[in-house]
Amino acid sequence: MKIAVLGSGGWGTALAMLLEENGHQVTLWSYLEQESKQLQATGENPLLPGVKLPAGLSYTWDLDCVAGSDVVVMATPSFGVRSTAEQIAGRLSPGTILVSVSKGIEKGTFLRMSQIIREATGDRFPVVTLSGP
């Protein structure tokens, strides 16, 4: 499967690593160009000290990485979920599965992250949630 993980924090990076190690073609998106280049150059995320990133992982700061993806994992901070979802809505292929892994509710609307993603993408894609304790 072709998978884009949006958000290169500790959670997004850990999920990207696991997905890549399980044989998927994974691209890890970072909001900042410099951060993306640093991950690629060092093979490490400073948020996960001592953990080597898999050689097969791809890095980008371009949201076009979602085009043609079978799955898009939304691992951005909650304050950036709506904006990111709105920006990718027109780039998604029919049938793309959106996975919400961001915690929290939106200030003002009190919507869950999965509800924001569904609303921002026009309710045209399946949205699932992965959460923990």
Task: Mark where each language-model region is.
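NAD(P)+-binding Rossmann beta1-loop-alpha1 motif at the extreme N-terminus of oxidoreductases
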Residues: M1-V51, S58-W61, Q87
